[in-house]
C-alpha cells in the first residue's frame, strides 16, 4: 500500500492506494495545532485499522497485548526496529514525555509493557500542584542528595526515573526468565542512561529506523 497525505490548514486527507494504483480509501482528519505527533500517529493507525490494514500485516510484528489495535504507533515502530537490530529478548525504553518500557520475547513478539510519567510531565506536576516549587528543565544530575529545590527536583525526577528503569528491568527479566538486551530511545534517553546501573544501549533514532524498516517491508509487496 502507498499512503498519500494532503496536509491542509483545516483537514488532513489520507488516501490509500494498492499496488495496482487503485484508490482503496479516503479519510479525513481535522488539523489541530495542539495535537502532538504521537496523537496524530494514533489517529492514523486507527484509520488504517478501520480499512483493514492491521499491524501484523503492515509491520511484521507479532503483538501479544490484549488489544493490538490500541498500541501506539511509536511503540510499534520501536518494537520493529528493536527486533531487527538487537538480540532478543529485548527491553526497549522510550524516555519522552511519558516513560514507556516494553518487552519483546525471544521470538521478537511484543509482550506488553509499562507506562509512567516522563521527566517533563513530572516536573510540570511538581510545579503545577505545589505552592513553591519552580518549573525547571531536565538537566544532568550531579549528585542524588540535592541541596536546593531545583537540584532536589532533578535528583527526584531524573534520578528516580533511572532507579525505576533499573528496577523494572530486573522485574521484566524475572518474568522473561532470562537476561535481555536493553535499548533506550527518546529525547531524555541520553540524560537518563548514565544514571542507570544496568547498561543501556542509547539509540536515539530507533523509532525512525522502525518506520524505515516498515516502509521497506511493504515496498516489497
Predicted stretch roles:
Residues 2-6, 90-94, 183:
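Short glycine-aspartate micro-motif
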Residues 141-178, 199-200:
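Adenine-nucleotide phosphate-binding core of ATP-dependent small-molecule kinases
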Residues 24-25, 54, 110-115, 200-208:
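Short hydrophobic/aromatic-enriched beta-strand-loop microsegments
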Residues 38-53, 168-175, 214:
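A short, N-terminal amphipathic alpha-helix
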Residues 76, 131, 163, 200-221:
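Glycine-rich phosphate-binding/hydrolytic loop that grips phosphoryl groups
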Residues 46-58, 178-187:
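Short glycine-rich phosphate-binding loop at a beta-alpha junction
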Residues 2-42, 107-134, 139:
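Short glycine-rich, Thr/Ser-proximal phosphate-binding strand/loop in the N-terminal lobe
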Residues 18, 60-130, 159-168, 200:
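Phosphate-binding/catalytic loop of phosphoryl-transfer enzymes
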